[in-house]
């Protein structure tokens, strides 16, 4: 079962990591740390170097337990501007900012959802 509080906490934590386009390194490092903590095999590359970014791709592998086609989950780490110093606020169940920055829901909400899915798969020993 999806843990909504944990999912929200994960999103809020990721939203506060500065990762405007070409400056995604901190977000990538956090994802590597979190994925390794979940026991996944993690690999990175130097894709960002080709276009002036300090970022990199993060690929993680969780072996399945039954035969079949793999499932791929994908999201991007960079945000548009103004995306530095994000301070998410929650009012009446709605997540927003003070208006001086974006929220970074695109695509840190996707990253948080992927991380929650992986946690649930592992916790419930799903195939």
Feature map (PLM): residue ranges:
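Intrinsically disordered, low-complexity segments enriched in polar/charged residues with Gly/Pro
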Residues: 1, 45-47, 73-74
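Short amphipathic alpha-helical segments, especially helix-boundary/capping motifs
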Residues: 4-9, 35-36, 88-94
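Generic secondary-structure signature for well-ordered alpha-helical cores
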Residues: 12-16, 20, 36-41, 119-127
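A non-catalytic alpha/beta surface segment that caps or lines the substrate-entry region
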Residues: 20-67
